[in-house]
């Protein structure tokens, strides 16, 4: 209030304000607003030449604006020694500064000391006059634009006044982002976006939420309640929006298309996520490990890795997860549910992303290519794993035995060796496994299923790895080479066996009792006395030379 009174007194002194009706100072002291003032310009000697205007003023900002208007409405030149106020004002101001005329533009560019040499008035002028804002009136620049109707203004104040046109009666506007709401309660909820307030806390796990409805949905995780059920397949969901998203799986509809590459999706969120593939910039960086992300939500999820927080626990096996979606996927291991089925071959999956990756087997699509060696993959994660082959990096180390891995999933699988835990049990024969994939493969023994068929000869296999090995027979490819002797093999296991033979010969070559047996192994591995004698047992001398004994006789 004191500041407003001081501003008003300075305004009266500098600009010349004649009060109509009640004295504004009295109004300010009584905390009444708005008040009405009649503003007059300073004129040269004759009060009769003064022009005036009347407007309603609101405190603070409009006093400043009105003062500017008064200053700008002065006559082009100021060539006077005495300035006086309009008739009716008892105060007379003597001006002994402006003995020389100044144009308006000169006044704007002149330093404050030239305009007001008195320290008191320099301070006042500095506070309430903004020359930069005034200049926009002459240049025609209108930097403040209305988002609703695209109308532009030279002053922010004018934009705020204009916005009231768009705000309907009985509407509530957010001061932070200007968003308008029909109800005050909706505005209150919206404000939590800016404040970060989360007043609704889960009594079960302590997790907090901004909205009560989100807490209600969250509680279903603990109760297991899923009120929204799909009529097509019977699958149930916590939230109605999840059911809506799920239904698209059955229709096959993909209305959301990427403008960059033409790829279509069945959900807008999937399209949004996909678009970040085209954006190389990753502005969101983890302070803990310097890993960067192209979405803030990804960074938020990543941070949980460092905190170790696992709020979502499996009731079946007690395993904890840091995301509800991960827990949902995990539960399918126990139930055996596989809702995502391939239309091409009938194979089913418990995760939609696995089905997407699987489909590329049929299409042959491999969009992810290694820049180092040119090898292509059907999934980005596989390319990431592959790249470690070139770097040799193994960041995931077992605390129990020190063994290192290039993937966290491999470390997780490895740890089960130490714990001896076998969660996955065959209902047919009771045999237990430490991996769900091993159980799935094992079940084919009972069912006789062999889903992997060779296109060349029609032979079928119960494992994809067996089919891969088999295909080499037709191609004749021998990619596994012995560094010691240069011999090549079509399977890594055959190379391993070959190496063991060499190691065994080095260890036992000086023992006469083992040389004859080793000779037979060497003959099978292809070591010969002379060309064209494949299959014959080599001489002991040849065995000794092969084993590195220097050819000494035994």
Swiss-Prot record:
Q: Which residues form the KRAB domain?
A: 1-47
UniProt keyword annotation of Ribosomal protein present: no
Disulfide linkages recorded for this protein, renumbered to the chain, are: none
Q: Which GO terms describe its molecular function?
A: DNA-binding transcription factor activity, RNA polymerase II-specific; RNA polymerase II cis-regulatory region sequence-specific DNA binding; zinc ion binding
Q: Which domain of life is it from?
A: Eukaryota
- What do the Gene Ontology cellular component annotations say? nucleus
* UniProt GO BP: regulation of DNA-templated transcription
Its name, as the record gives it, is Zinc finger protein 714
**Species per Swiss-Prot/TrEMBL record:** Homo sapiens
Q: Which gene encodes it?
A: ZNF714
């Amino acid at each position: 209030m004191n500041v407003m009174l001081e501003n008003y007194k300075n305004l009266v002194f500098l600009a010349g304000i004649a009060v109509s009706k009640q004295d504004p100072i009295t109004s300010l002291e009584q905390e009444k607003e708005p008040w009405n003032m009649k503003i007059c310009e300073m004129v040269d000697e004759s009060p009769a030449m003064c022009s005036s205007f009347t407007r309603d003023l609101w405190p603070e900002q409009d006093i400043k604006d009105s003062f500017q208007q008064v200053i700008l409405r002065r006559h082009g030149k100021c060539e006077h020694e005495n300035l006086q106020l309009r008739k009716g004002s008892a105060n007379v101001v003597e001006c002994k500064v402006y003995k020389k005329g100044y144009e308006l533009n000169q006044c704007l560019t002149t330093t404050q000391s030239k305009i007001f040499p008195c320290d008191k008035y320099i301070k006042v002028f500095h506070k309430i006059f903004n020359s930069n804002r005034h200049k926009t009136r002459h240049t025609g620049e209108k930097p403040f634009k209305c988002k609703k109707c695209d109308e532009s203004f030279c002053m922010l104040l004018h934009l705020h006044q204009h916005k009231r046109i768009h705000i309907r009666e009985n509407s509530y506007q957010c001061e932070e982002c200007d968003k308008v709401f029909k109800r005050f309660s909706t505005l209150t909820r919206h404000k939590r976006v800016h404040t970060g307030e989360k007043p609704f806390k889960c009594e079960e796990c302590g997790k907090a939420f901004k909205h009560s409805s989100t807490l209600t949905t969250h509680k279903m995780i603990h109760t297991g309640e899923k009120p929204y059920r799909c009529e097509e397949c019977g699958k149930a969901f916590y939230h109605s929006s999840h059911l809506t998203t799920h239904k698209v799986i059955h229709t096959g509809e993909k209305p959301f298309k990427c403008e960059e590459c033409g790829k279509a999706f069945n959900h807008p969120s999937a399209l949004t996520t996909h678009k970040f593939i085209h954006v190389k910039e990753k502005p969101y960086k983890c302070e803990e490990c310097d890993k960067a992300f192209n979405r803030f939500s990804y960074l938020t999820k990543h941070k949980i890795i460092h905190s170790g927080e696992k709020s979502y626990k499996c009731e079946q096996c007690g395993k904890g997860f840091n995301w509800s979606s991960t827990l949902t996927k995990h539960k399918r291991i126990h139930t055996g549910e596989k809702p995502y089925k391939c239309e091409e071959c009938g194979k089913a999956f418990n995760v939609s992303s696995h089905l997407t990756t699987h489909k590329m087997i049929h299409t042959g699509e491999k969009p992810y290519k290694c820049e180092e060696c040119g090898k292509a993959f059907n999934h980005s994660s596989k390319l990431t794993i592959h790249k470690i082959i070139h770097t040799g990096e193994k960041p995931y180390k077992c605390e129990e035995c020190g063994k290192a891995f290039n993937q966290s999933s491999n470390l997780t699988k490895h740890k089960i060796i130490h714990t001896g835990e076998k969660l996955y049990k065959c209902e047919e024969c009771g045999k237990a496994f430490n991996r769900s994939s091993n159980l799935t493969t094992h079940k084919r023994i009972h069912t006789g299923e062999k889903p992997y068929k060779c296109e060349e000869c029609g032979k079928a296999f119960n494992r994809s790895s067996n089919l891969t090995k088999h295909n080499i027979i037709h191609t004749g490819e021998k990619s596994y080479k012995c560094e010691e002797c240069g011999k090549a093999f079509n399977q890594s296991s055959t190379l391993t066996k070959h190496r063991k033979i060499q190691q065994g010969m080095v260890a036992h070559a000086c023992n006469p009792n083992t040389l004859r047996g080793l000779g037979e192994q060497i003959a099978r591995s292809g070591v010969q006395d002379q060309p064209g004698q494949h299959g014959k047992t080599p001489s002991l001398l040849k065995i000794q030379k092969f084993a590195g004994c220097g050819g000494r006789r035994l």
